[in-house]
């Protein structure tokens, strides 16, 4: 893609605009302006690499063994590893994009327990080693689109969620899948202090319809760039649903429960008119306070190289997933 050297001011400052708008939601939850501005040092750290300056590499995780199936490889330009692991939303560790990388080292990911329960014939529990050894791992290069209208392309490593669910044998009553993040206030400052964590109700919870969870694209993710996930990216295991906005990609999962009824989800509870259950990437359905028609791709350049590009329906995965929503009004079911 040819670089646009004549960026509009809105292209360069869009992140501050979107962050201020997200702050409006958090303010409605009772979070003060002072708290929302902390910590200021994170801004300087973040801007250092947006200006093209060198940053220390993300903490190295354990190297993983994985295959690279041709079906999941492509020629999309990758977002550099330091940006994938240095520009994150993980409010359990703070509101600024650099806070997770700065603060998530406190999260203990081994030992770890992931329980699969609910409407299943065979409930099961996985430990830390099971997450990387029980299923063949594969690298998948996926687009990632945040609801804040920025995007990345990331080489995730993991296994299809449907393989895990198949072991548990969902019953005929199972219609939805509910996910839950670890609740560990002593390790996650945002869970301990509502000002640091944006006033959200914790633990963070998410959900999918069962057919969405069983789709081949839906990935239980344990690594990135060839190594185990760093804590700020959701170690030791997170969800990636590439046709949905990033907040559906729940991190540091400890519970998967199959249910009869649609489960609650964190951002929908916080602002139901702004964050729907489905959260499918859709350039034709705007957020109430900003457009979703375009996005800023975070690539290898500095802030002056940031590109605005059209957002693709279902984030470019329409051919694979559009049939899941046949007959569903995507404006009503956003």
UniProtKB/Swiss-Prot annotation:
Localisation: Periplasm
PTM comment text: Exported by the Tat system. Can also be exported by the Sec system.
CDD domains: YedY_like_Moco
Pfam hit, one: Oxidored_molyb
InterPro entries in UniProt: MsrP, OxRdtase_Mopterin-bd_dom, OxRdtase_Mopterin-bd_sf, TAT_signal
Protein induction: Is induced at protein level by hypochlorous acid (HOCl), a powerful antimicrobial released by neutrophils, but not by H(2)O(2). Induction by HOCl is dependent on the presence of a functional YedV/YedW two-component system.
Disulfide pairings: none
E.C. designation(s): 1.8.5.-
NCBIfam families to which the protein is assigned, alphabetical: PRK05363.1 (NF003767)
Task performed by this protein: Part of the MsrPQ system that repairs oxidized periplasmic proteins containing methionine sulfoxide residues (Met-O), using respiratory chain electrons. Thus protects these proteins from oxidative-stress damage caused by reactive species of oxygen and chlorine. MsrPQ is essential for the maintenance of envelope integrity under bleach stress, rescuing a wide series of structurally unrelated periplasmic proteins from methionine oxidation, including the primary periplasmic chaperone SurA and the lipoprotein Pal.
Name of the protein: Protein-methionine-sulfoxide reductase catalytic subunit MsrP
